[in-house]
Amino acid sequence: RIHAPMNRPDYFDEVCAFLGASYFRAIAKNHTYGLSARGLAIKTAEPGGEEFPAFVAYWLERPTQEAGSVVVHALLDSRSAAAAFRFVVRPGEATIFDVEMTLYPRVEIAQVGIAPLTSMYLFAANDRAGVDDFRPAVHDSEGLSLWTGRGEQIWRPLSNPAELQVSAFADTDPRGFGLMQRQRDFGGYKDLEARYDRRPSLWIEPLGKWGKGAVHLVEIPTDREIHDNIVAFWRPEAPLAAGVEHTLSYRMHWCWEAPWKSDLAPVTDTRVGRSLTDRSRLFVVEVVGDK
């Protein structure tokens, strides 16, 4: 666990924690803990079962007294691969991780997940069918945001499906993706204990060209908010060859909102219901902005 004077100059808040296996999580100023990240995902949502790599050793560079960042090194190991990670952690209004990963597959890996994110989505205001809960919404993240290599901006609302659901968004050299918590009004959740309105968003910014591949979104059915049921990651189109060094770098933004500003007005709500005039379905999409 790493502590720093983030909210007050006289108190060292917990900034991030490495949680076991390859899981870790972080917060920025005034956040409460929410979604997590992992070092590497292998065979996620595959019929044969998932492989869970683990960080087996850590090294910490001692920061100077005036330092605004700290460097963590980690060794990851699993049956299929080993990897070395370097994290530069900078806490603040948004907490930034600069990540360098050097991966050595022991076998060819086709079902790999780079920069995997793990979150929870139970329900929201627009999908409360069958929900018996006083709260309007319960989720750590409400949507997958994508900024493609072609500049397209995509927002995919999350769901709690009846069966396992996997979606893939093909891309070349993505500019970024993340699991975002956009609703920041306490009234959107009305939960004084969980404070979902203060959960961080997590945006992944590739550093360098990632080539062809796809952002995968895995949605797992759940009936309780204690279970993480959302996974998102980047999967290269070509399998990772065994015995070859693979290097990737990316920046993680644990933030209140996406670190890039869209020039498009965002969709804030989508409502669906029966038409009052015939048997058709009526879709009402609310957009806020002037573009």
What are these regions (language model features)?
Residues N7-Y33, I114, S119-L248, H253-D263:
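A contiguous, surface-exposed recognition patch within enzymatic or periplasmic domains that forms
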Residues V88-A94, E237-A242, G273-L276:
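Short, solvent-exposed beta-strand/turn "edge" segments of beta-rich domains on protein surfaces
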Residues W260-D290:
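Surface beta-strand/loop "capping" patches
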